[in-house]
UniProtKB/Swiss-Prot annotation:
Pfam families referenced in this protein's UniProt entry, alphabetically: Pterin_4a
Residues found modified as N-acetylalanine: A2
Lineage per the UniProt record: Eukaryota, Metazoa, Chordata, Craniata, Vertebrata
InterPro entries documented for this protein: PCD_sf, Pterin_deHydtase
Gene designation: Pcbd1
Subunit structure, interactors included: Homotetramer and homodimer. Heterotetramer with HNF1A; formed by a dimer of dimers. Interacts with HNF1B (via HNF-p1 domain); the interaction increases HNF1B transactivation activity.
Gene Ontology process terms (BP): L-phenylalanine metabolic process; positive regulation of DNA-templated transcription; regulation of protein binding; tetrahydrobiopterin biosynthetic process
Protein family (similarity comment): Belongs to the pterin-4-alpha-carbinolamine dehydratase family.
Identification of the protein by name: Pterin-4-alpha-carbinolamine dehydratase
Keywords for the protein's UniProt record, in alphabetical order: Acetylation, Activator, Cytoplasm, Lyase, Nucleus, Tetrahydrobiopterin biosynthesis, Transcription, Transcription regulation
Length: 104
């Protein structure tokens, strides 16, 4: 990805986070990151979702922290480069939402 990531300012957070909060993303307590848990009909759909997200994450060179058990996928996003939330996390979370909606 071009350019160094910067940690979102309070003003940027106020502008960028409400749409994600509205669909269930939460800020983690004690860490500058966002988190959401997704539920799918079965393991195949959960794995298909993860595959689509993984392909986009690789293109963006920005990878989620995630955990999968059967039909549940837990995702945490934070940018290591700036030790906190960046626009990269917001963009990836928005893409993840689009994929999740298309898989339900």
């Amino acid at each position: 990805m071009a350019g160094k990531a910067h940690r979102l300012s309070a003003e940027e957070r106020d502008q960028l986070l409400p749409n994600l909060r509205a669909v269930g993303w939460n800020e983690l307590e004690g860490r500058d990151a966002i988190f959401k848990q997704f539920h799918f009909k079965d393991f195949n759909r959960a794995f298909g979702f993860m595959t689509r997200v993984a392909l986009q994450a690789e293109k963006l060179d920005h990878h989620p922290e995630w955990f999968n058990v059967y039909n549940k996928v837990h995702i945490t996003l934070s940018t290591h480069e700036c030790a906190g939330l960046s626009e990269r996390d917001i963009n990836l979370a928005s893409f993840i939402e689009q994929v999740a909606v298309s898989m339900t």
